[in-house]
Regions:
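Conserved small/polar residues in nucleotide/adenosyl-binding loops
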Residues: 198-199
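Juxtamembrane/interfacial segments flanking transmembrane helices
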Residues: 40-45, 131-142
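Short, Lys/Arg-rich, polar N-terminal cytosolic tail immediately upstream
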Residues: 1-13
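Structural signature of hydrophobic alpha-helical transmembrane segments
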Residues: 52-67, 111-120, 124, 182
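C-terminal ends of transmembrane helices
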Residues: 23, 27, 71-82, 132, ...
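Short amphipathic alpha-helical coupling elements at transmembrane boundaries
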Residues: 47-54, 141-151
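Alpha-helical transmembrane segments of multipass membrane proteins
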Residues: 28-29, 51, 70-75, 97, ...
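Mid-bilayer segments of alpha-helical transmembrane spans in multi-pass integral membrane proteins
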Residues: 93, 97-101, 112-133, 153-156
Length: 199
């Protein structure tokens, strides 16, 4: 009886919105307060938004993230579960709004320490998000849609996308920043692996 009630609560709207708010908020904190001041990029679509922002210095990363996600959410609405897409739309809103308006910088001068700190904060946030029925948009939705439509492995597509992103980043942007970004990616991947101990 108790376990049934717990499962029902875990699938409920308030709990999932709480997880998405907390997780996406932490991810945005790691990006805005640590990664951006050191010109680091994360993986996925948000990493693409950061790279475009660094190279063009036009729109903010948050705005680029929203623009890049528009066709992704349209595809997700057609090929992925609509409940998942609606929760993910909320997650995208939290990440984008927090990244746009959060005015905070964690004063870390050493780029390696900054990469580790950004990885820990972002990884903790994404680990929490993984406990919800949703995501922060972007690569997760693309991967699921391609898997459902064409049977492409979610993990393989994510890996291929991020390899392509970093190859382009190395060739088009500051190699030092990209190497530090790889440290950040490695750290937050490890933190995400331990997500069961977080929530």
């Amino acid at each position: 009886m108790v376990s049934t009630a717990v499962r029902t609560f875990a699938r409920g709207i308030p709990w999932n919105l709480f997880l998405l708010t907390l997780g996406c908020g932490l991810f945005a904190l790691g990006v805005k307060a640590v990664a951006i001041p050191h010109m680091l990029i994360s993986g996925g679509v948000f990493g693409t938004a950061l790279l475009i922002n660094y190279m063009t210095e036009t729109l903010s990363p948050a705005v680029w993230n929203v623009l890049l996600n528009i066709p992704i959410f349209i595809a997700g609405w057609l090929f992925v579960g609509r409940r998942f897409v609606l929760y993910s739309l909320y997650g995208l809103a939290v990440v984008s709004v927090a990244t746009q308006y959060l005015d905070m910088t964690i004063n870390i001068t050493d780029p390696i320490l900054a990469s580790i700190a950004a990885g820990c904060i972002c990884g903790l946030g994404l680990g929490i998000v993984l406990h919800s029925i949703g995501c922060d948009g972007g690569l997760t939705i693309i991967s699921i849609a391609l898997h459902k439509r064409y049977g492409i492995s979610v993990g393989q597509f994510s890996l291929l996308y991020n390899i392509t992103l970093f190859v382009l980043a190395f060739s088009m942007y500051n190699p030092d920043s990209m190497l530090y970004s790889l440290i950040m990616i490695f750290v937050y991947s490890k933190v995400m692996e331990d997500r069961k101990s977080v929530v």
